[in-house]
């Protein structure tokens, strides 16, 4: 069992399948298991080719059976070309029919605001998701290419709240694994990430490195016509927030963010020590089969790691493609049952976080308290609700507020 798996098992969650599901989730930078049919290949060790001035590393001559072609790189050792990531097999899915773009609700919208809203609401639904990440540029003298990342999930995205100028979308993983005899497993469900969209948002909290977030105020001219996207972790703690704008031209509907900082994704957190901030621009693109989250990321050193240096220290660039494809089966309706049982608790968590963010110009998060991460305190409580314990709003409020007070620190 990996260290990540052990962490989630220690959370004491009622469903062991929930712990398993988390192993395959790179929270908010999503990710898990391979989608290709057949038994997954055993992972191969990464070779250490001699570095070159270009940073690409020495590779065998073309035609050698030990190399393979990798897009954007050319020929690389086969062990590097083989993706890392999850190794489980998902149950078969039925893809929904493709839709003609622009979507009718976008084409028929009376103004830009209505078109933007229609595009955001179109992100909801049931999906097969595939996660693809590959480093495309190395910037250090001793840089060597690393294996790309490829994983999968089946995910339900629901509209949690819609007040017109604000839309909240909640992601819930509903995973069906393939048993050895080819039959699908029982669904394995867990709360995943959340994305909040706010029109002309002038009050943002952006990631600053070192597990710290700070308020950024924007003027009216900067935010006119824009939408912010705020992304939250599985425990509803903040991850990153960025302004961006939707563009609708013919079949194209795309939201493009400003350049923004993000914490390391979970897929990198335990294996990379050479950088601590992901700086990038990302796009949300509607497609005939669903939508695409495209990322162009720079991996950089910041915060305490940078010491007293003011010049940016970049180590590599990465391309990310998270592809959301609509499905009609298997049914992911068990997500509805989960939210009926736990929704009131998570609403308290969101309100508590909103209060904390509103009163703080800057705050930081402790990584753990008494050996437990923040999500463990929340998921342990939620597990009791899933087991049938009656919901007590006052008790939940006390638990949430007390828990956050132990993890959040910084001036008010």
Indicate where each model-derived feature is located.
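Bacterial N-terminal signal peptides that target proteins for export
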Residues: 2-17
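C-terminal motif of bacterial Sec signal peptides marking the signal peptidase cleavage site
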Residues: 25-27
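Bacterial signal peptide processing site
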Residues: 29-31
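Short, low-complexity, disordered segments immediately C-terminal to signal peptides
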Residues: 33-44
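N-terminal pre-domain segments of enzymes
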Residues: 43-110
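N-terminal helix-cap/turn-to-beta initiation motif at the start of protein domains
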Residues: 110-126
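Acidic, serine/threonine-rich low-complexity disordered tracts
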Residues: 275-283, 288-393, 397, 401-411
């Amino acid at each position: 069992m990996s260290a990540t798996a052990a962490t989630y098992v220690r959370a004491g969650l009622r469903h062991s399948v929930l712990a398993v599901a988390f192993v395959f989730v790179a929270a908010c930078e999503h990710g898990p298991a391979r989608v290709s049919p057949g038994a997954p290949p055993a992972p191969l060790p990464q070779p250490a080719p001699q570095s070159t001035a270009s940073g690409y590393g020495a590779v065998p001559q073309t035609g050698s059976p030990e190399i393979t072609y990798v897009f954007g790189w050319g020929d690389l050792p086969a062990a590097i070309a083989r993706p890392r990531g999850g190794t489980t097999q998902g149950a078969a899915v039925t893809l929904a029919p493709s839709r003609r773009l622009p979507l009718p609700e976008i084409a028929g919208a009376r103004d830009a605001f209505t078109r933007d809203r229609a595009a955001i609401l179109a992100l909801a639904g049931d999906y097969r998701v595939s996660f693809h990440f590959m480093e495309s540029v190395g910037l250090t003298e001793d840089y060597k290419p690393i294996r790309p990342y490829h994983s999968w999930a089946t995910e339900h995205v629901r509209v949690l709240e819609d007040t017109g100028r604000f839309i909240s979308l909640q992601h819930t993983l509903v995973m069906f694994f393939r048993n050895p005899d080819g039959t699908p497993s029982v669904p394995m469900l867990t709360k995943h990430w959340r994305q909040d969209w706010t029109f002309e948002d002038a009050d943002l909290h952006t990631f600053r490195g070192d597990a710290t977030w700070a308020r950024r105020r924007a003027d009216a001219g900067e935010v006119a016509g824009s939408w912010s996207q705020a992304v939250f972790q599985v425990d509803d703690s903040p991850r990153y927030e960025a302004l961006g704008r939707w563009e609708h031209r013919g079949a194209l509907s795309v939201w493009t963010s400003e350049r923004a900082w993000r914490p390391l994704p979970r897929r990198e957190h335990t294996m990379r020590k050479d950088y601590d901030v992901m700086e990038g621009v990302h796009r949300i693109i509607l497609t005939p089969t669903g939508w695409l989250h495209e990322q162009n990321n720079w991996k950089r050193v910041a915060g305490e790691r940078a010491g007293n240096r003011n010049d940016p220290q970049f180590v590599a660039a990465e391309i990310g493609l998270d592809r959301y494809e609509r499905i009609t089966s298997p049914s992911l309706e068990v997500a509805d049952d989960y939210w009926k049982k736990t929704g009131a608790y998570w609403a308290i968590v969101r309100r508590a976080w909103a209060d904390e963010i509103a009163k703080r110009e800057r705050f930081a998060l402790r990584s753990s308290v008494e050996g437990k991460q923040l999500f463990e305190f929340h998921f342990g409580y939620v597990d009791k609700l899933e087991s049938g314990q009656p919901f007590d709003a006052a008790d939940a409020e006390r638990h949430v507020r007390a828990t956050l007070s132990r993890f959040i620190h910084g001036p008010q």
